[in-house]
Amino acid sequence: MRVLHYCRGMGKGGEKDDCPPRAAFKGSPKKRWVVDGVSYDLTPFLAKHPGGPDFLLWSANRDISIAVHTYHKDPERTVLPLLRRYRCEEPAVKSVKRLMGVPQFLLPPQFDAVTDTPSYDWGPGTFLADLVKEMARPAVTRAVKAADAAFDRHALILLFMYGVIVSAWLSCVLRPSVAAIALILLRTALAGAGHSFVHRPKSPWGALFDFNYVGHCTTAVDGHALLHHGYTQTEADVKRGFFGGMMGVARAYRVPIHTLHKLGHVVTGCLVRQVDLQLERDAEEHQGVEDLKRALGLGNWAHVGFWAVHVCLRVELYVAWRQGLCWSWLFQFIGSLWLNTLLVVSSHDFDDLGDESERDWAVFQLAETHDMSITGWPRLDCWLSAGLAPHRAHHLLPYQRSAYANIASEPAIRRVCERRGIAWDPPKALGSEILPVVARRLFAPACDPATREALYADAVAEHASWRQLAYCVSYVAAGVCGIGSI
């Protein structure tokens, strides 16, 4: 690697870049980052990145133009001048992994990141440029800061409540049915807190994302914060395949088989996948983030939160079994799993795609997202929806630190919409507008997980096929091995 040339640059404030020792790069894969058609070697900058090295390492050998322009408040002033110090002469097309370093089953067949990832305009006349000016108003800045502080306080209170409820439940002080219902709501709320923390730089609290048995905080940094938010509703959006594996299961078997699949994740699968992530090497379908961090001598504390949460979840399961609370545990597991699964897939209408020719990224995001209403009280809906209720602001301002900040930002967004003649639709009601659409999708005929083409001629063939039985067995086994929706 041509490292020494780039290490001679000066960092922010005139200090030298904190480059890892030359020996640390020996044998490390060549890393490049593409921004606006230009290739850069940001390896010497990894230790200096204000958001920590993880966001950069997960996005290595990709076009990160969208992330640069949307995860920074003023990239023209703060980021683009800095990038010039790390420019490479290598053609950008040679720097991009065709599969973006993610498993192929998460992407459409024949996907090629060079040709299939979208590009957008980022000039001064765009919606995002106007929104940045609105967000810079002192009143808006103060409101967002106060909202973040309130969110953190409330998240801490919910975590304390969770500890109290679990202790009372496992001590047989609290009625099992009451505890189960409380845990379903608290797991959903804590996952909402983790959802916000995953977007924050260097926050171990992102592990709260895993409390609902659906999320996986380590892969969420990439699959959610980078790929989904950057490439919403395009072929590069891995969230569009969230239902993927289960759609190959016959509709009458789908709910119980997917439940067993996720139970396998809880018992062993998440742990297997985490160990795999921490040991895997860089390849076309893997980013090898932890392996590269070890090679470069960078800090490796990112997974402490994951192991703390997952040890807690398994201790709960073990103690519940010893205390004779298995049915109560199973009830809260199934309730948490399916409530949060339906919330995830209800946050976008994946069957109703907008105008893919739209070059204004923020306008496209507005067209492809919707807000959700459960009670009509925005802050309460944040917790009941796992942080998904104020969804339009979340997608337009992915760098914000909390769901409360998204609520506080809504007036600024609406002002820009009004000036541009863009309609601001009211939030969709979860019960009457969203769940019926999700239910139709959930109970659709079995189809190929990747292409979504029908697999059987009719419902009888779908449920009586030996091939279907074999698929169900393999799908459950995949959960035990940590393969599937994580």
Predicted regions and their residues:
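Extended hydrophobic/aromatic segments used for targeting, binding, or gating
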Residues: G324-V363, A444, Y456-A457, A461
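Membrane-embedded catalytic scaffold of the fatty acid hydroxylase/desaturase
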Residues: I181-H303, D352-P449, E462-W466, Y471
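B-type heme-binding environments
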Residues: R2-P138
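Polar-ligand-bearing catalytic/cofactor-coordination segments
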Residues: G11, L80, D116-T117, A129-R142, ...
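Cytosol/nucleoplasm-facing, intrinsically disordered, low-complexity tails
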Residues: M1-K16, D36, Y456-V460, A470-V473, ...
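Alpha-helical bilayer-embedded segments of polytopic membrane proteins, i.e.
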Residues: A146-L190, H258-H265, L292-L343, A461-I486
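Membrane-proximal N-terminal segments immediately preceding the first transmembrane helix
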Residues: G125-V144, R281-V289
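Long, hydrophobic alpha-helical transmembrane bundles and adjoining juxtamembrane helices/loops
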Residues: Q110-K133, L159-I165, L170-L186, A193-F197, ...
